[in-house]
């Protein structure tokens, strides 16, 4: 089974690379997509439309430009993996989870046990909760297997 998997969330660790490498190591037929993970590039996505000294309007333009990419990728994915890290609050990841839920797209959350409570609604709509990228790879192995 060929799948497209959208990787959403925390950008400060190598969890995406671990999942992609694990899928490659197991020969899984998976195409991975993701939002722009370079923070500065994402923040500047709307600058092409004109510089803005007001932080709100700069962020507003950039979020709309970024949404062109993320909305299409979420709409076209088979599964989303949504990572919530330990250090920062990932509002974008929570938004992506809600969008997946609204579209009926299955998603798996990836986060530590100590943030279960604040993510209870996000986890309730998820198909699974994993704590490590290795668990995600095992789940992907299972859902792509022919048996």
Where are these regions (language model features)?
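Conserved catalytic or regulatory cores that recognize and/or transform ribose-phosphate-containing ligands
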Residues: 1-147
């Amino acid at each position: 089974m060929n799948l497209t998997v959208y990787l959403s969330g925390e950008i400060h660790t190598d969890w995406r690379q671990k999942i992609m490498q694990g899928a490659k190591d197991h020969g899984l037929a998976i195409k991975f997509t993701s939002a722009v993970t370079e923070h500065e590039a994402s923040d500047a996505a709307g600058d092409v439309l004109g510089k803005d000294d007001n932080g709100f309007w700069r962020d507003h333009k950039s979020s709309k430009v970024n949404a062109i990419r993320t909305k299409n990728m979420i709409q076209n994915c088979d599964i989303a993996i949504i990572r919530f890290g330990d250090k920062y609050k990932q509002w974008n990841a929570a938004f992506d989870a809600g969008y997946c839920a609204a579209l009926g797209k299955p998603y798996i959350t990836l986060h530590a046990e100590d943030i279960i409570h604040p993510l209870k609604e996000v986890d309730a709509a998820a198909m699974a909760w994993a704590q490590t990228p290795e668990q995600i790879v095992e789940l992907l192995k299972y859902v792509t297997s022919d048996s």
